[in-house]
């Protein structure tokens, strides 16, 4: 008779049957909850699909697409210049960055990147840095509101209102400006705008210090943000995360310094970093970046010199020595009197630009700039016609949302709110 071998089950002192039974019972206690898409703490129509066990998040996934606008597809049916009015509406909190990235790509395809007037580049940088401040103010205001710091919300929107008034004085609109155009700008700064910017830059530093005094050493604020939403450099590199989330890991990566555009290499500013990899570090980075943006904006105002704001090429833009109307369609009285009354050549160019548009040589290009949320890239393809063959945007909010699971799985539900706020996603850019 053959002896039967003895089987010994060892699993940390427990029998496998007991482990399987315990695992099955634990799963029964987990529930799936939808946070959003209509929720005040998801920064727009973001849907977070949570699997929770008690108050602990065991799994989280992002559901997007609720704000899809088809902007990239629409660009294929509009002229290269008309495209500006579409891209400015993607990340609606930082429209100047959308416009500038798009126009830099068109200018590279046209081969006129080195011909942009100095004054136009200075004004572009000025508007982008003011826009960076206004965007960060919204991030801090909404993030504070979601964690119960209502005073931070009031302060943030109060300061942002001053910046939007300057935008309105310069472009005619508080948002969706379509002010940056291929070849330069839609129009020059109006009379008195330079002084308005100087007055704004005198007020902002003190107002920002008020917010810092309120939050930097606030016990509750630090308790809700320190150690929350942790994501180290390895995680950021694996997921392609950029912007304040990446710089909060200690890596000084900023495209304004790494790959300068619009003359950023001529400005004095510091790339702000932090070492803690958490929500509190991202808050500190945004606050300090606003001070650096003020420094850059002050340099811009000092650099302003009289000159054109559009390339002097009648096949690309309205004649640089003539003013265009607020809508950029060249309908100022001076312009109309010139092209309709005395210049047959001007009338021909005007007719071709309006009815057909600019012909962009065939080719493709990728351009990236540093938006308030990270690397905003645009890959555009031209087939040699008057409309893009394809334009694709690499929006930082879309990429950065990938980090939600890495930041929040294993954390508390309350910490999820702080983590998403520290990413600062804008769904217009995610879905576009």
From Swiss-Prot:
Membrane topology, from the record: Peripheral membrane protein
Reaction(s) catalysed (UniProt annotation): a quinone + NADH + 5 H(+)(in) = a quinol + NAD(+) + 4 H(+)(out)
A molecular function (GO) term: quinone binding
First-tier enzyme category under EC: translocase
Pfam family, one: Complex1_49kDa
EC number: 7.1.1.-
Any Gene Ontology CC annotation: plasma membrane
Record keywords: Cell membrane, Membrane, NAD, Quinone, Translocase, Transport
Main location class: membrane
Localisation per UniProt entry: Cell membrane
Source organism superkingdom: Bacteria
Family, per entry: Belongs to the complex I 49 kDa subunit family.
Function statement: NDH-1 shuttles electrons from NADH, via FMN and iron-sulfur (Fe-S) centers, to quinones in the respiratory chain. The immediate electron acceptor for the enzyme in this species is believed to be a menaquinone. Couples the redox reaction to proton translocation (for every two electrons transferred, four hydrogen ions are translocated across the cytoplasmic membrane), and thus conserves the redox energy in a proton gradient.
Subunit structure: NDH-1 is composed of 14 different subunits. Subunits NuoB, C, D, E, F, and G constitute the peripheral sector of the complex.
NCBIfam families, per the entry: NuoD, PRK06075.1
Protein name as it appears in the record: NADH-quinone oxidoreductase subunit D
UniProt organism field: Mycobacteroides abscessus (strain ATCC 19977 / DSM 44196 / CCUG 20993 / CIP 104536 / JCM 13569 / NCTC 13031 / TMC 1543 / L948)
Lineage, top ranks: Bacteria, Bacillati, Actinomycetota, Actinomycetes, Mycobacteriales
Gene that this polypeptide is encoded by: nuoD
């Amino acid at each position: 008779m053959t002896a039967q071998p003895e089987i010994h089950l060892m699993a940390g002192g427990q029998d496998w049957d007991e482990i399987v039974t315990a695992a099955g019972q634990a799963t029964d206690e987990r529930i799936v909850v939808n946070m959003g898409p209509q929720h005040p703490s998801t920064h727009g129509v973001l849907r977070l699909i949570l699997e929770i066990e008690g108050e602990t998040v065991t799994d989280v996934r992002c559901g997007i697409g609720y704000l899809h606008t088809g902007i990239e597809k629409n660009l294929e049916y509009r002229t290269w210049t008309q495209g500006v009015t579409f891209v400015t509406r993607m990340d609606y909190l930082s429209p100047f960055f959308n416009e500038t990235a798009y126009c830099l790509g068109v200018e590279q395809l046209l081969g006129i990147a080195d011909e942009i007037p100095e004054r136009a580049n200075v004004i572009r940088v000025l508007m982008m840095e003011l826009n960076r401040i206004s965007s960060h103010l919204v991030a801090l205001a909404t993030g504070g509101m979601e964690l119960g710091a209502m005073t931070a919300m009031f302060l943030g929107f109060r300061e942002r209102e001053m910046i939007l008034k300057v935008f309105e004085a310069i472009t005619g609109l508080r948002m969706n400006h379509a002010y940056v155009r291929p070849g330069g700008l839609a129009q020059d700064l109006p009379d008195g705008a330079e002084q308005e910017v100087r007055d704004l830059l005198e007020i902002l530093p003190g107002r920002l210090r008020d917010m810092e005094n309120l939050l930097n050493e606030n016990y509750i604020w630090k308790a809700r943000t320190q150690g929350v939403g942790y994501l180290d450099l390895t995680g950021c590199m694996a997921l392609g995360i950029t912007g304040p989330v990446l710089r909060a890991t200690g890596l000084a990566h900023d495209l304004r310094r790494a790959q300068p555009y619009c003359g950023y290499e001529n400005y004095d500013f510091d790339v702000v970093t932090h070492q803690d990899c958490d929500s509190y570090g991202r808050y500190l980075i945004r606050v300090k970046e606003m001070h650096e943006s003020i420094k850059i904006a002050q340099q811009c105002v000092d650099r302003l010199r009289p000159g054109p704001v559009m390339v002097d090429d009648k096949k690309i833009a309205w004649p640089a020595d003539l003013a265009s109307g607020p809508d950029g369609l060249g309908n100022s009285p001076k312009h109309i009197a010139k092209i309709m009354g005395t210049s047959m050549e001007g009338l021909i160019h005007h007719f071709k630009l309006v009815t057909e548009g600019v012909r962009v040589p065939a080719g493709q290009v990728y351009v990236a700039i540093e938006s308030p949320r990270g690397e905003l890239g645009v890959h555009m393809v031209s087939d040699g016609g008057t409309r893009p063959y394809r334009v694709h945007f690499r929006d930082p909010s879309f990429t950065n949302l990938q980090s939600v699971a890495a930041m929040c799985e294993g954390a508390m539900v309350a910490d999820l709110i702080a983590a998403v706020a520290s990413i600062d996603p804008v769904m217009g850019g995610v879905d576009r």
